[in-house]
Design a protein with these regions (language model features):
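Intrinsically disordered, low-complexity terminal regions enriched in Ser/Thr/Pro/Gly
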Residues: 399-700
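N-terminal leader/linker segments that initiate helical-solenoid repeat arrays
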Residues: 40-91, 95, 99, 103
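Residues within mature, well-folded domains
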Residues: 134, 166-167, 206-211, 222-459, ...
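Canonical tetratricopeptide repeat
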Residues: 88-91, 125, 159, 200, ...
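Structural signature of tandem alpha-helical TPR/SEL1-like repeats
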Residues: 62-70, 95-111, 133-145, 168-186, ...
Length: 700
């Protein structure tokens, strides 16, 4: 029989405890060794993994980002906190430009920052990733942290400036604009080769309305990059802001000599400034006709047509340039002139007021980023709205209805808006013209009236006077550079003093444009006139009558003189008469037929009819024709000794009501029975009342 122990076990209790103790110690030692080896490896990769890192770095430089990630994957698993390997992996993942890649990069960079909070390169990478993902608040915090550690970090200054620029465009805070200037200025101080920073700093000074500072920055930059297109363009804009148009024009010439044909086409495109009807017509023209169309278009808008410089086209180039600088969308590459705000700027210039709204809070109504620009002109106020539909920073027109908005009406009926800064007090000259038949052809006389209150009394021979005649296509035909020497003065208590200067040109029948300029160098005032003139054909073979010349003064007695000589008439270029002064006029009759008695006879009939006002009704106009105080009709017969006659006429217009009228002359040859007519508009006003009421007189 076998003996059994009491415990029922083959091993003693002491030996069992000893085995368990040794097993526990072995496990602890093994874990410690593994942790030690793992820790050393995560800090210092071995030769095998370093070779893998070198291969990955080469692939990254070759822009093979997916292969780079595959090569780095084992390193990321075995050495998760090794900075260089993880940083390269994050950069490669980000470079794939996928959502998953950016997510992985963000996760790795945040982990690295927790282990290496003082590594500026890691923080830079994280900040730029936040900026790329449009997490601007996070990016701003990272760049501000970098600048606290290193004030000369030019990259952080520049990126922070970009964030502030975005905020300025959205919210219009002057504080953001000032700080944006500070950040870009700090960038160019530490990095003189950052072309984008120079360009953005100059643009910021432009928005700050500091062209002097803008030029200082650009001149410094152009010393290093004399052919930089944006810098040359901004220089032209800066000179324009200072009112130095000639210098601005030189810079624009330099700009166009450097840029390509496509850029020149963008800056010279007039499609935004003409109506859709004219745009369709323009597209059907050939190349030569298009060039003529554009030249005529710009010349017609020239605020100073007597000079070689066309400030209106300079303003157009300025607006296109500003739209490029301020509204180009960096993310999509959309040029500024193709955005809503850019187009509005090119059409109308800068608005008087700007509004911005943007709400994404749960407690408020959803609102996409919206810009509203408020304008006001002679037609009244109007506004243009833009919306950032994709939250991309690209604003486009807000089209909420198919009904014509104020913007649509402005586009179709008044597509251009510009008010030139002449750098002087500007007044408009009074102007009239009349054509007379002479031996050499039609002689067109021009009568210019300068209000004496606008020029300094003194030697009129020292006041420059410029007159230029253009044909209908704005080709210069004649130019006279003279003074006001020889001008005559007319003054009455109710009219005020007017200085009258006469010029004459020999012109063929047709349509012309007359440009006149008077510059008082003492007071600095500038008198301008741009008027369309039609020269009538006056026949030498049959009865004809000259244009009607309105006059302030004429000789009381009729003097028989040769046609057009020593008329003794003081022209009235204003076309306005103040009762009780009569309407005075001068005209000439040509080619009368001789009667059997050797004399020449003709009948003159004149009619004065009211001109229908723009705001009047048709039936009101018809009723005025039957009002005894609204029209005058009379006739008389004249007998003269020659086939041509110089006629002077005074008409009492005291019975007429105040308003605008048309004088119609009808001359009938009593022998040949031929008839001819001539017309002239004038305005009749009343004498101011004794109580001091203002006169209603004006100049049509």
């Amino acid at each position: 029989m076998r003996n059994e122990s009491p415990s029922g076990s083959d091993l003693s209790p002491g030996r069992d405890l000893c085995l368990n103790f040794y097993l526990l110690v072995s496990i602890c030692l093994l874990v410690s060794v593994c942790l030690l080896v793992s820790g050393c490896a995560s800090t210092v990769p071995g030769r095998k993994y370093m070779a893998r890192y070198e291969r990955a770095l080469g692939l990254y430089q070759e822009k093979k980002y997916e292969e780079t990630l595959k090569e780095l994957k084992p390193l990321l698993i075995h050495f998760p906190v090794w900075a260089e390997g993880s940083l390269l992996y994050a950069r490669a993942a980000r470079a794939t430009e996928t959502i998953e890649g950016r997510r992985q990069a963000s996760k790795i960079l945040v982990r690295l920052m927790s282990n290496y909070p003082d590594r500026a390169d890691i923080r830079h990478e994280l900040a730029s990733l936040y900026f790329e993902q449009r997490f601007f608040t996070y990016a701003r915090n990272q760049y501000e942290t970098l600048l606290r550690a290193n004030e000369k970090d030019s990259e952080s200054h520049y990126m922070l400036g970009l964030i502030l620029q975005r905020d300025w465009k959205r919210y219009g805070s002057k504080k953001d604009l000032s700080r944006m200037i500070t950040e870009f200025a700090s960038t160019v101080e530490t990095d003189t080769l950052n072309r984008e920073a120079f360009s953005r700093l100059a643009a910021a000074y432009l928005e700050k309305e500091r062209p002097d500072s803008m030029l200082l920055v650009l001149n410094r930059f152009l010393r290093s990059y004399p052919s930089d297109l944006d810098a040359v363009m901004l220089g032209a804009i800066a000179y324009h802001e200072q009112g130095k148009y000639e210098q601005s024009s030189k810079e624009w010439d330099r700009f166009f000599s450097l840029c390509d044909a496509a850029t020149q086409g963008v800056f010279n495109d007039i499609s935004l400034l003409i109506t859709p009807q004219r745009r369709k017509k323009f597209k059907r023209l050939d190349k030569a006709a298009k060039e003529q169309f554009v030249r005529t278009f710009w010349k017609g808008l020239d605020p100073t047509p007597t000079t070689e410089l066309n400030e209106r086209i300079l303003e157009h180039w300025r607006r296109v340039g500003i739209s490029k600088v301020l509204f180009t969308v960096d993310a999509s590459g959309t040029p500024g002139w193709r955005t809503g705000p850019g187009e509005a700027l090119i059409r109308y210039g800068f608005p008087k007021n700007r509004e911005f709204s943007f709400t994404l809070e749960e407690t408020a109504a959803l609102s996409l980023p919206t810009l509203i620009w408020h304008y006001s002109d002679e037609e009244g106020p109007f506004e243009v709205a833009f919306v950032d539909y994709a939250l991309s920073g690209e604003f486009q027109y807000f089209e909420f209805t198919r009904l014509p908005t104020a913007f649509d009406r402005k586009t179709y009926y008044s597509p251009t808006s510009y008010e030139h800064n002449y750098g002087a007090q500007v007044f408009h000259n009074l102007f009239a013209n009349a054509g007379f038949l002479r031996d050499s052809g039609v002689r067109e006389e021009l009568y210019v009236g300068i209000p004496l209150e606008n020029v300094t009394k003194g030697d009129w021979g020292k006041v420059p006077f410029e007159a230029v005649i253009f044909d209908s296509l704005w080709n210069e035909l004649s130019r006279v550079s003279t003074t006001l020497d020889g001008a005559r003065t007319y003054a009455e208590p109710d009219v005020g003093g007017i200085l009258i200067r006469e010029l004459s040109f020999g012109l063929a029948p047709g349509r012309y444009v007359v440009a006149l300029a008077v510059k008082d160098t003492v007071s600095g005032t500038l008198g301008l006139t741009k008027a369309n003139v039609t020269v009538r054909a006056l026949s030498r073979d049959r009865l004809s009558v000259s244009d009607i010349e309105l006059a302030y003064l004429m000789p009381e007695k009729r003097v028989e003189t040769k046609i057009g000589k020593d008329k003794g008439i003081l022209p009235n270029p204003s076309g306005t008469y103040v009762v009780p002064k009569p309407l005075r006029l001068y005209y000439e009759v040509y080619n009368l037929a001789r009667g059997r008695d050797g004399r020449y006879r003709f009948v003159t009939k004149y009619s004065i009819l009211p001109i229908k006002s723009a705001g009047g009704t048709f039936w009101g106009f018809v009723a005025s024709l039957f009002s005894g105080q609204h029209y005058i009709v009379n006739s008389f017969e004249r007998q003269v000794e020659s086939p041509s006659s110089a006629e002077r006429l005074s008409i009492d217009i005291s019975a007429l009501r105040d308003g605008s009228y048309n004088l119609i002359l009808e001359v009938e040859d009593s022998v040949s029975k031929q008839r001819v007519t001539a017309e002239r508009a004038f305005e009749k006003v009343s004498v101011p009342s004794a109580s001091g009421g203002a006169s209603t007189r004006g100049h049509p």
